[in-house]
A protein has these predicted regions:
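Hydrophobic structural segments
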Residues: 1-91
Length: 91
């Protein structure tokens, strides 16, 4: 039986926080770099696009009527990946 080899690269990359386009460009660069090194598959951490919402822990994120939270979440939602919109097409 023939052996099949799969080379997997694990990328620990910081996002361009809350900037979907810039982070997508960064991911694309890392995919190319890993492929040049022989990777067949490149794995990135969850929440890389658009970045983990760490502010929830630091800004009283559970407050429903907080104007600050509403602004932060609106920007976060605006930068989120939407498959149907084609956000991952460049990758």
């Amino acid at each position: 039986m023939a052996s099949t080899r799969l080379t997997i690269a694990l990328a620990q990359v910081a996002p361009a926080w809350l900037d979907r386009a810039a982070t997508t460009d960064k991911v694309s660069t890392w995919i190319d770099r890993a492929a040049d090194e022989g990777a067949d598959l490149v794995c990135f951490g969850e929440a890389l696009l658009p970045g983990y919402p760490f502010w929830v822990e630091r800004t009283d994120g559970a407050r429903f009527e907080s104007a600050l939270q509403k602004r932060l979440y609106a920007h976060y939602a605006e930068q989120a990946v939407v498959i149907e919109r084609g956000d991952l097409e460049p990758l």
